[in-house]
Every structure is written in structure tokens, then in C-alpha cells.
A protein has these predicted regions:
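Conserved catalytic core of the tyrosine transesterase superfamily
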Residues: 1-286
Length: 286
């Protein structure tokens, strides 16, 4: 037990470094913390010096068996390798581990899934009050699930949602009037004092990302959409505002992206509308 506590302490020191020296955002730290803890629970070692490439490969196999995509596994692997390199720099040795032999998984092309306004309305008919709010805020505001999970009262100002997003970038978005009215009702009925999404009314115990993902998936499944994942709503937000006239630069700002190339990957399903856009933006006569 003492050695296990020692590992926990070493991880805490690494996370403190990420927070105070690297100045990583709250959601980035939350993700790193979860990945590190889950990794150690899977491999079950008493000391970091026991870590080997066999442990890494077994962890990758376990992630694959759980249905994680190659892209997800590689993202988690990058976080683990960053932690291990930090430990090496701090003088911790891994006699049985060769970092250069850690190989990334083969990635399939990313799923290009998005939903139209009509499909979202169809899904919302199956949602209860909380499920409706979670889905609608993601679609209205283009939120990442980590941003949705971390929402607090201090982030709300009327219809505006202001927060620190990915890469510690300040961002604001706006919800519909209907969503605001329903959210106000939720806050009042559940006696919200800090975190918006709580497990028990009146208590400031926030839901986990996994809790929220489960709640959002249920109405999509009932509406006939079997392979829902929350980030598809962010793609849906981007495609929806593009279809209604937003420029790529405007879409970039509304999503909070640093690079326009990232935004381009979020816009789908415009094929049937290209003639309209050419006529509107290219061939309009004075």
C-alpha cells in the first residue's frame, strides 16, 4: 500500500507541474488525471520502476477491447508518454521500458457524423428535462462535453455562456431563449449554487463526463440514432451555422478554434447546397 501511495504522490506532483508551470486548463487537467489513474488501475504495479513495454501493450489491448477507437487510444497514449518523459527528467528510471518502442495504433478515418436541426428536434421529443438541456446547450452553443460538464453559475450571464475552453482560450457563446428559460427552471428547482449539473439537488457534487454522455445518448438511441457521441453535436453546430450563412472565419470564432484548418474539418453535408452558395457569394449581380 505504501508503494501505491508513492505512485499516487508522483502523479500528483506531475499534475501540479501541469497546472502551475504549464498552466493547463481545468478540462485538460481533468482528462490527464483520469487517464493516469485508469492506466495505473489497469496495469496494477507497486512501483514505477516495474513499468515495462508489456504493460503498455496490455493497456492498449484493454482499451481496444473496450471499444475505444485508435484515435482515442493514441490521444491517451500521448498523455501517458508525456507523463513518463516528465518522470525520466525528474530522475525516475524505467529499466524495463523503452519509450521509443511504444507504437501508436492505426487510426481509422474519423467519423463524420452530424445532425440537422430537424433531427435534433426529433431527438428532443424523447428527452426529459435534463437530457433536453444537455443536448440543446451543446447544439445551441457548440460546447465540448468537457465544457458542458464544467459549467458553473459564474459562467452564465443571461443567454451568454462565458468560459475558458480548450487551450486556456476565453470563449463566449449564446443559448436560445427557450434553453435559457428551461435552464433557469433547472437551476431553481435543483437549488444550484455552483456547478450546473449535479447528482443530487442542493448538493454541489458535479456529474462526471461519463454521467453526461450516458444521459445524452439515451434519447438519440430512442429516436433511432444508434451511434451517437457528444462531439457530433459540435460538428452539427458548425454545419448548421454554415448552412444558415456564417462564413468560415465566423464559424472559427464561434467554435473557439485557433486554426482555420481545424474548423474546416467540422463542416459537413454542404454538397446539396453548393449551387445556392455559389449563386449567393459568387454570382450575385449588382
Amino acid at each position: 500500500m505504501k508503494n501505491l501511495k508513492s505512485i499516487d504522490k508522483q502523479i500528483d506532483e506531475y499534475l501540479n507541474y501541469c497546472e502551475n508551470v504549464r498552466r493547463m486548463s481545468e478540462q485538460t487537467l481533468h482528462g490527464k488525471r483520469w487517464i493516469c489513474r485508469e492506466f495505473l488501475k489497469t496495469i496494477k504495479i507497486d512501483s514505477l520502476s516495474e513499468l515495462s513495454n508489456k504493460h503498455i501493450n496490455e493497456w492498449i489491448a484493454e482499451q481496444t477491447a473496450r471499444g475505444c477507437s485508435g484515435r482515442t487510444i493514441n490521444s491517451r497514449l500521448v498523455n501517458l508518454v508525456a507523463m513518463l518523459r516528465y518522470f525520466q527528467d525528474m530522475g525516475i528510471s524505467f529499466p524495463k521500458l523503452k519509450l521509443r518502442l511504444i507504437v501508436k495504433c492505426k487510426e481509422q478515418p474519423p467519423r463524420r457524423v452530424y445532425y440537422t436541426r430537424e433531427q435534433i428536434e426529433q431527438v428532443l421529443r424523447y428527452a426529459d428535462h435534463l437530457e433536453w438541456l444537455l443536448i440543446k446547450l451543446c447544439f445551441d452553443c457548440g460546447l465540448r462535453i468537457s465544457e458542458l460538464r464544467n459549467l458553473r453559475l459564474m459562467n452564465l450571464n443571461g443567454r451568454m455562456v462565458a468560459f475558458i475552453g480548450k487551450g486556456s482560450k476565453a470563449r463566449e457563446s449564446y443559448m436560445s431563449k427557450e434553453a435559457k428559460n428551461r435552464l433557469d427552471d433547472w437551476i431553481q428547482r435543483n437549488r444550484i449554487s455552483d456547478f450546473i449539473w449535479v447528482r443530487t439537488p442542493g448538493k454541489n457534487e458535479p456529474m462526471s463526463v461519463e454521467d453526461i454522455r450516458y444521459l445524452m445518448r439515451k434519447p438519440f438511441y430512442q429516436a433511432g440514432f444508434k451511434n451517437f457521441y457528444p462531439h457530433a453535436l459540435r460538428h452539427s453546430f458548425a454545419t448548421d451555422i454554415q448552412k444558415h450563412g456564417a462564413s468560415l472565419m465566423e464559424t472559427k470564432e464561434m467554435l473557439g478554434h485557433a486554426r482555420i484548418e481545424t474548423t474546416e474539418r467540422y463542416v459537413h453535408g454542404l454538397e446539396g447546397h453548393l449551387e445556392y452558395f455559389f449563386d449567393k457569394y459568387k454570382f450575385t449581380t449588382a
